[in-house]
């Protein structure tokens, strides 16, 4: 039967033209259903439809409807009597509204199928209508009122019909008929209004008949207009109520139901009932039905009360829908199916309403009334019979069972729907479907309940009803429906408390009140009722308050009436139920508009209903505020509930969630309010639970006997009714109404208490008792007490609510709550341990207070816990404000409720209640808001502000009060008032000043320093705050720098702002640590400065932080907060912070003197007294010392930082003491523990700390440190470390310098001595001779090397300086620059090393050895021979010597053809040596001359020696030269290059050079013939000439042409020794200095030589043999292979040294640098443009680089920049050396500098070695005279196979290259030197690269090598060289002359 009616209901909604609504719900599941309902509403709302709806709606309105249908058995008559068509139409209406929404398509189809039963149909339809409305709102999301409007039409018609029938029917009869009207009513509001306008009109009429409700209805209708939200609601409930209640009650009831969802309806009905008040049992049922119709009136009344709400409904259709969908509406059409949720709620309420007298009818009719009144006791008592009756009539059990399933399901489905947003969108119909689906689950949960008893089913129905309520609440009736729904939730928890179904209840939902109901016949029903009573029951209670509110509803009823007057606030009552989430949502929604109004009106109204639950609802209302607060904390209160409170009752919780979701729908309208709303719902649920609690106790007796239940109900009813009447009559006077109500509660409660044998009952009884007590003690207090179980139920809430109905409930409860909370806690526990236990668990999840008041098993766990938790945190600090906002928002929506709503929220913040703290907090807030709390802080829970004093016996309280006021007035400088809470043993009071409340601590701080406490005869023995002060170890201290004078730190708002800031800061620092709930408790606030100061401070704030596990250690909080910077922390607190957070009590380690061995002492300077006396100083120093320890590892070993205990070290300050002395010294004594907790010894600790830099330590510590950072206390005389350090410094400062100096001296000595030895070794000549003999093949190398050496050196020099100038070459130069750049210095050193090495390893080769010896000889001879050239020559010699070493290697390389890189390097190095040797042979005579010229005896001696050796070997040398020359001539290279040089060089200079060279050669050949002076001059010229290399170097320096020539020669040399090419070629390319190289550019080379002849060294001595550069090119290809390899290297190295480093110096010696520069310039000018092009110099010029001020390197192009640079740079330095005429010194230097260059170049190839030999013999002097800038390397490069190419190709190429410049070189074969470079790489890369740059591609080395190949005899080579040198000397002579 149930299912059929449900199906019908579903059908009806379809027909009830709710299409739009259903579409809107579509978003939810409900839209289609609504649409169908709307469509089916008027016409198709047939009983079948209703049946179908009922049948299919086990989950949604139809569930509630079934009950209504059952109830309607009585009301049915009325319906039929009123209008048979009305029933069907009503059914259609109802179905369309709720069933369409709830059932959606499925339900609709079912409803269509099962429209058989009119009563069920009506109930179903009516309820469905409500659901549809809810759906519409949900769809609208509070935005869409079209559905409302559409539904309104339907509803209007249907509700009117129903209303009409309802009033006529007697309450009992009307149970069933009433059910039908109920359905129409519901449909009327949403769809029926438009669909069933007639009915609506009737309803309106009824409303008008209802004194108050009629007005409301009118208003509601007016405000709603087409929107039949009021009608719909009123229709639904009013019809039911109508059945129960008398016709006169019906109009009001209808209005109430319509407008306030069930709550409004009840309120109206209660009003009516109370007025009718007769036979509350029976009369109430009629009034209920009347209320159903009056519901319309009530709606109107509500509208009147809160036209805003009506407006709100209109504004927020969703809200309206929610209300309509709300169980209130849903309940009214309680079908067996609908009953599941709505029915159960309504059915129970109806039962309650019906009471014993009208059990069957009343049960059904009571369904509404029981919701309203049965919410509490009468609900419980009557529900059993009622349910029984109803089930019997409508097969209530069936409906109940399905209902139970539905209720759970509905709740579940609601949540699910919400989750799906189906429910949200179509709370009405979609919800139903959801409900159905969840019904099975819920049913499963419920089934145990059901098994418990038949009532369980019914209760389940109420649960289902609740689900509908949530849907309805979505609609404009959402508030009330929410209330109902919430009530259901509450009930279920209560049921759980009741006992049998506790577990089941939880599983099913908070609403599993069904289990409760099952448990006690009406227990379950009660639970349902309670749930409904939370919202719907409240409505019912308002209709039939006395019964329901008995214990909890008495107040509720009273409040209900006031609520109703308040307006929709009564609807808001619903929030007290789980719907409170929805209600809360609606409350929030109300802020949105409709929701708020509904919230305010309904909730308040509900509050009225709930007065006891009201307290509950009062909590709901406060909840609204609380919710606002809560929402801020937990926007998804329902979900929280679900998880926490309803974890067991997932489904029930789901419903709650659903409500919440609906709330969110409302939320959609007003998301802000929604969120708060959800939290509110939690609170509401708790409150509801409270409400339930009182009722269940009553009920349990009822369950034992239905009649008992009825009796209880009656008693309750009477009391409630009385109070309710009072309330109603004094709507505005909440207090009076409440007062009355509380008394009835007391009476009722008394009954309930005894009757409550079950734990639930016990709980309820406890709640009731509390209520009674508060009633007796304090009207508000009694209410609070009653509410105390629900915290919100505090009478204050009730009275306040009545008074500030809109803000209601919340404000009122706040004041009462504190008392009630305590009372409740105890009574609760005492009344029933089971209940207590339940309550206890709840508080933990929620608030401590709240939890205790609520049963943990009860819905409170589900609702309360989360909400509580949210409330707890949010409420205290922000609850009031948020709540206020929400409330105001809600109230805003309902105009009347707004103000109160605003008031209420502020109280919410208070967290006062401990047991019912959450609820209390919620209620407490309302209490504050009771009169729109005049205080800026919520004193609802005044614990924070209460001061408890123990008075002396002689103290007179009046006097004490006056004295305290006076003391405080004087201190605070403003008038204060004392609010005394207790006058006896403990004098408890709080202090206010205008709107401000002084914190307890601020008052205590004043009193304890006053005479009242400290006087000789104190009147006050002790003063303490009423709250518990945490242990000091939990306390944390924060110091504000100051507060503005306008800020009074004693005011509550200051501490609240600080608490809020601290919570925010804690959240910030812990946001990454997961979720957490922390509350801050301000323990003390003290301020230092006087009130007068412009800045009052510092302000010390001591607080404690409480988490879920209790208080957190102060050190832990301090560590957390100190992660913030002072600025950040100041930002959070809103005031500048001086000290972030320090533990109030610091942990102390073992400070025993026995552990003194671990104590460390540090003395700080500059610590002022203020800092020293700061209590934080030791802690700060501990932290800084720990940081200092963390620095130790970092300082010591960064990579081991992690392994050190740095951050893990623990420092404990033992003592801080002031010392005598200057600068405020302070001694810190402390010890250190490592990360393992092991104490470190003082020595170890101090050693660790002392590893940190003193300055760093001072920075970290923030103070200067005296002496050592740390020293053991036991050994204060710890100078040992100092003395050790001092000793160490002595060692470091003395020993190390001594060692360094010694090493330097040794090195210098070794270098100098070694150089001298090398240079002056007497066996040099012999060696040279031998070498030359051996070098015969290397004679080629000799000449070539000479040239190359000179040029090579030039190259090095060029390279050195050129690199920058020459971009392209620079790269190569860079590499060569290793030889070149470094050459100046590097070359020198390397050269020296190489030279030494060469000498050291004379075993290079036969030639190498001989070369070495010859080099030595040359080195010695050359200097001697050319004293003049000593300076230059010395460098040259020096260079050559080193070069000789290199040459040796080079020679070896040359001969062995070892890797060219090595050869190149060696060539460069060796070439100088060889050159020296070779040069020395010719030099021997010149040296003698040279010394004369040089004026240096040593030089002369050396020269003489060299000359002697040279003479001895002259023939051999000449022979070699001749061979070389001949070879070159044969090849045509020798002469040709010479020709070039001559042609290109300065003819005069070259001639001069040549002459000098010739003379030198002659002297060498004929030592006797050589005259020192002449020889020297010739030598100079000869060297210059003969070492065109030097000239070339200079030329290279001065002119790239020479460099090229050299390169050409080098190429030739490289022919044999290609290694040098890279370097040597480069060098040569710079400016050919080789006699042969000059072949191409020999003119330049000769010129250079001419230039250089002035140089101390007679570079041209060997030049004579050298043909012109052109010849050299031709002949030297062959000769230079040998000669250049030998000559060029040494001459070049020398030159390189001289040129690079030495040449300039050497030259300067003979010729000032200016001369060199002049030469360079001359070179530049000297060379003809063609030559310039050909000449490196010209190239140099081509590069755009002017020849270096010094003679441009022969290969300027290569390194014109390099060589020139080298020369330029070196020239001057070398000059001094030359000036010094320290050939050796210069040579040494050059040997160091140049040799590196020179050697590197020669090292490149064997040619280098050969050249070195030659160079040693002849070029050494030349090198001395002019370091061959074109090093042997260059020579070798030139001497390379490419030499011929250079000679021919290279000539042009070189020209081109010169023209092109270095870049061209790099691209040109010269730059191909890489192979040469490859050789030279062994040579310093600098040279190599340089050479490479100059002539990487030059084939000189090859060709020169070829030329120099051993094929030529020494004599022929020498002869050829001599000839070439002669030519070159001529050319160079002119050049030199020109330069000179």
Swiss-Prot record:
The modification Phosphoserine is found at residues 1377, 1384, 1543-1544, 1613. It comes from Mus musculus (Mouse). Pfam families: KIAA1549. Residues 808-840, 860-877, 1421-1435, 1759-1769 have a biased composition (Low complexity). The modification Phosphothreonine is found at residue 1611. O-glycosylated. O-mannosylated by POMT1 and POMT2 and elongated by POMGNT1. May play a role in photoreceptor function. Residues 788-797, 878-903, 1722-1737, 1901-1915 have a biased composition (Polar residues). It is a multi-pass membrane protein. It is found in: Membrane; Cell projection, Cilium. Belongs to the UPF0606 family. InterPro entries: KIAA1549. This is UPF0606 protein KIAA1549. Residues 788-917, 1362-1451, 1579-1599, 1695-1782, 1863-1915 are annotated as: Disordered.
